[in-house]
């Protein structure tokens, strides 16, 4: 399926699908100058004089922008799409910290880094996506949790705006419904009510993924109760469907999710179960292959070994294709 390239990680895709790197590059963490993200806890931040805390936090956020730029360039070099990390801006959306980006002493440098990211993305035409954490639940009964979700989703959508990502499903923001309190109709209505509070560009990017737990939202439930009421595209996750098929074959579930994306190229998710008692746990590497059923979409690899797993899978596919 791939042409061999005499470089440690480069490969050329012989079809339109691109594989997706999720957040972290393990290959770029190797060597003397590892590209690693940095964080800061609120306990650490609040234990310092505010000016010192803001300076440290600003330096860490700037580091995260530099690392993100390195990873996006790496993805461009290796024909991959990229899911930006949801931990790039520690504490910025945390209420108790009460921080705006403008408060950081290196704010101008951070703005310059946004410009650099935008140029890297535009020059290399790398597809960018985002998958905010599982704690973002628009259908929650907890109003504080919903407010935090709206703040978080709007913030990351505005960041995607700032770095030049289109406000549509070419740059999707993927979340789960993650709620089963009430009937499906009630849950969908709560979701819609809170979805309507999001910024327009955030609404234009949001897509919903099928769940892996038996008491949550399968592809069948999403197609039956959610999609008809919202027309929001559905992200098909191979492993989640294997854990919670709800009577649908993989082919039917994938094809039906594919159709919800309309004229946009879907971005789906692939992983496999780690050996053990929990089938939902993600494996380090892929030991199997997947079936596209003749459809064209991009595919985020949600395997623990990140880009090392993508390279390993690509090499196996090339060997099988020879």
Predicted regions and their residues:
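N-terminal amphipathic/basic-hydrophobic helices that include classical n-h-c signal peptides
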Residues: 1-16
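Alpha/beta catalytic barrel-like cores
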Residues: 14-127, 136-165, 169, 197, ...
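Loop-centered beta-sheet repeat module
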Residues: 176-191
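Short acidic, Gly/Ser-rich segments with clustered Asp/Glu that frequently serve as metal-coordination loops
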Residues: 214, 239-245
